[in-house]
A protein has these predicted regions:
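Conserved class I S-adenosyl-L-methionine
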Residues: 148-163
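N-terminal, positively charged/glycine-rich alpha-helical extensions of SAM-dependent methyltransferases
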Residues: 1-16
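Class I SAM-dependent methyltransferase SAM/SAH-binding core
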Residues: 48-52, 56-107
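Short glycine-centered segments of the SAM/dcSAM-binding site in methyltransferase folds
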Residues: 48, 147-148
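A conserved beta-strand element that flanks and buttresses the S-adenosyl-L-methionine
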Residues: 118
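Conserved alpha-helix/loop element of class I SAM-dependent methyltransferases that forms part
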Residues: 27-45
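A short glycine-rich, Lys/Arg-flanked "PGG" loop and its adjoining helix->strand segment in the class I
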Residues: 133-145
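Short catalytic micro-motifs in class I SAM-dependent methyltransferases
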Residues: 121-125
């Protein structure tokens, strides 16, 4: 019998993501609040957002109260993680126009470019530099001229500490 890797998003442990990520990333909420503040200052009325790695729902939870009339596209290859995003929005009673894609970004074609694109805490899950470069390029190709793209990444192993 093979065991599921707990770092794969279809593993049942992934459902604990929203609880565990805050203990692993100092200032987790601040990353998203600063991003929302930058969007507010630079574009008072963004029409649409592309959220890459949308599982957990943090970006949606942060943006929707400030930009309730915007359209959102949430992309994540994990059904479990998208389920968490939907559950979080229901618990917070946040409503918006959201299209969910349980796909990798490279497998989805959009008819429009986006005013804002985000990719937070995703790149470190990709194995090679080529995969990371490909994802960043795909995001850049989906940002409208004058639009904004936000990235954050972990550059170390989460379960190890260096001294």
């Amino acid at each position: 019998m093979t065991q599921q890797n707990p770092f794969q998003w279809e593993h049942p442990k992934a459902l604990d993501y929203n609880d565990t990520i805050r203990r692993r990333i100092l200032g987790y909420e601040a990353i998203f609040q600063l991003m929302a503040d930058l969007v507010q200052v630079n574009n008072e009325n963004p029409k649409n957002f592309l959220i890459v790695g949308a599982g957990g729902g943090q970006e949606l939870s942060t943006f929707i109260p400030s930009f309730p009339n915007a359209q959102y596209v949430a992309v994540d290859p994990s059904d479990n993680m998208l389920y968490l995003a939907k559950l979080r929005l229901a618990e917070e009673q946040l409503n918006a126009t959201i299209d969910y894609y349980a796909e990798e970004l490279g497998h989805v074609v959009f008819p429009q470019k986006f005013d804002v694109a985000t990719c937070h805490l995703v790149l470190h899950f990709l194995q090679t530099i080529e995969q990371k470069k490909s994802l960043i390029e795909a995001i850049a190709q989906n940002v409208a001229p004058g639009g904004m793209a936000f990235f954050s990444s972990i550059n170390a192993e989460l379960d190890t500490a260096s001294t």
